[in-house]
Curated annotation (Swiss-Prot):
Residues 144-152 are annotated as: Flexible linker. This is Holliday junction branch migration complex subunit RuvA. The gene is ruvA. Residues 65-143 are annotated as: Domain II. Has three domains with a flexible linker between the domains II and III and assumes an 'L' shape. Domain III is highly mobile and contacts RuvB.
Length: 205
C-alpha cells in the first residue's frame, strides 16, 4: 500500500497530477485545493496517498496533508458519498474549515460544495461530528499550553479542545478563554467534541 509519494511534478491537469518518482509516472487524483497548491512542472512535490484497488483498476488519490486524507476517508464512509463528492467537498473547504463547519453544525457552509445539497450536508454533520480527526495535542503544543490557562488547570478533554482550536488557527489566549466558557456551560465532565463545539460558538460571537 502506498502511503506517500515524493517526486517531481510532470503534468498538472484539471483533476489530477502526474508525479514522476524515479522515472515512474504516477497519476494521482486530487482536490482542486491540493492541485492549486502544487508547484509547477519540473519542481519537487510530495503527496499523502490513499489507494483504491478494484478488480479492473487501481486509483491513487493525493492530499497535501494527512488531515485532508483523513477527511477524504471519513466522507466516503457516508452513504451516497463517493470519491467525486468527497474531493468536491475538499476542493471547496480546507480541512480546518470543514472541521469548524461540522463542529458548529453549519450545513450551509458544507452545502457549498458541488453535489452536496442541504440533505447531504446534514448527513455529513450528523455522522461525522463525533469522528473529527486531528484533535490530539502534540508534545510541543501541550508544552506551549502547559504554562497556564484552562488546559493546564483541567487537562484531558479541555486540553485537547484547546489544542484543536489552536490547530484551527486561534491564539492560545483566545482558545483558553473559549474553552473556559465552554466548561462553565457544559461542566467539567464534558467530552472534547462538546467543548470544541461550544468553544467555536464562543469565538463566533
Amino acid at each position: 500500500m502506498i502511503g506517500k509519494l515524493k517526486g517531481v511534478v510532470d503534468t498538472l491537469e484539471e483533476d489530477h497530477v502526474i508525479l514522476d518518482v524515479h522515472g515512474v509516472g504516477y497519476l494521482v487524483h486530487c482536490s482542486g485545493r491540493t492541485l492549486s497548491a502544487l508547484p509547477r512542472a519540473g519542481e519537487a512535490a510530495a503527496l499523502f496517498i490513499e489507494t483504491h484497488v478494484r478488480e479492473d483498476q487501481i486509483r491513487l488519490f493525493g492530499f497535501s496533508s494527512a488531515a485532508e486524507r483523513d477527511w477524504f476517508r471519513l466522507l466516503q464512509g457516508i452513504q451516497g458519498i463517493g470519491t467525486k463528492t468527497a474531493l468536491a467537498v475538499l476542493s471547496t473547504l480546507s480541512a480546518s474549515e470543514l472541521t469548524q463547519a461540522i463542529a458548529l453544525g453549519d450545513k450551509t457552509t458544507v452545502a457549498r460544495a458541488p453535489g452536496v445539497g442541504p440533505r447531504v450536508a446534514t448527513r455529513i454533520i450528523t455522522e461525522l461530528k463525533d469522528k473529527m480527526p486531528g484533535f490530539s495535542a502534540s508534545e510541543p503544543l501541550a508544552a506551549q499550553l502547559g504554562g497556564g490557562g484552562v488546559a493546564s488547570a483541567q487537562g484531558g478533554a479541555a486540553a485537547d479542545a484547546v489544542s484543536a482550536l489552536v490547530n484551527l488557527g486561534y491564539g492560545v489566549p483566545q482558545a483558553n478563554a473559549a474553552i473556559a466558557a465552554a466548561l462553565r456551560g457544559a461542566g467539567e465532565g464534558a467530552k472534547t467534541e462538546v467543548l470544541i463545539r461550544l468553544g467555536l460558538k464562543e469565538l463566533a460571537k
